[in-house]
Amino acid sequence: MNILKLFFVFIVAMSLVSCSTAAPAKIPIKAIKTVGKAVGKGLRAINIASTANDVFNFLKPKKRKH
């Protein structure tokens, strides 16, 4: 059991050393902005459609009950 724990500690230490030399990941800011604009336009379209539906329901003639 102790050999297994020592092996895991060794593997973790080696992975930390090897990862420290890797270049930091770059965040694609332009892609995030593009997606944000698309989502914003979609939400705006949903809001406009909802408003148009509310206006239509307000103006359409109501059915009379007998």
Curated annotation (Swiss-Prot):
Signal peptide: 1-24
Organism, scientific name: Bombyx mori (Silk moth)
Name of protein: Moricin-2
Tissue expression from the record: Expressed in fat body and to a lesser extent in hemocyte and Malpighian tubules.
Annotated localization: Secreted
Protein induction: By bacterial infection.
GO cellular component terms given for this protein: extracellular region
Protein's gene: MOR2
GO biological process, alphabetically ordered: defense response to bacterium; innate immune response
InterPro entries, A to Z: Moricin_fam, Moricin_sf
Primary residence: secreted
Family: Belongs to the moricin family.
Task performed by this protein: Has antibacterial activity against Gram-positive and Gram-negative bacteria. Probably acts by disturbing membrane functions with its amphipathic structure.
Record keywords: Antibiotic, Antimicrobial, Immunity, Innate immunity, Secreted, Signal
